[in-house]
Amino acid sequence: MNVLDAGIEGVRSITQPCQLVILVPVAAAVVAGRASWRVVVAAVSGIAVGGWLFITRAIVVGDAAIRWSSLIVICAFGVLLWRRARTPGDLRAAPAVEAVLAAAVGLVTTTWWRPCVGEQLGELLTRGPNEPWATLPASVAFMVGMSTPILAIGLIRAAWQPTPRVAMTLGFVAAGAGLLLGLSVVSGQHGEVVATLFEWSQP
């Protein structure tokens, strides 16, 4: 299996709405975590690991478990919201907590995924359950490619360097949005949203 082809297909897949179920909450977590490179790398790592577990069917999550898993996302965004509400002076410490929370959001939201299957991902999903380690490199390549918007947020943050007040405001808004997304999953809206995104992704 060609790792490069899998990565390219992952990049191309970001135009498909069905990927938003992962990208939107993770982007919110990254912005809420001040989009440092530590937070960005942690978030993408969470997506990569979660995606591999999804592809290999190492973890199969039903609707009830998805609603329970959303509590992790709600707690993560709750902590991020609380930290963003603190004064700028309290935000100067290295964002280790934000990195852990972003990784958790990336890992959990992959269990909410209903992927739009292309050639490479289709092969991964077919071979993954029986050949988990053989499909690991290509699976990671696909998920990292799909995470290109998250990496772009890190680049924009590095180039822009917003003031502490602006960064805190953006983080506060992003954390609040992520909290609402988590609550929508708990309330049972996830299935309808994912089905709609999947339909939008069909040619």
Model-identified regions with their sequence ranges:
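Hydrophobic alpha-helical transmembrane segments in multi-pass integral membrane proteins
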Residues: 54-56, 108-119, 178-191
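Transmembrane helix boundary and interhelical junction motifs in multipass membrane proteins
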Residues: 17-25, 112-124
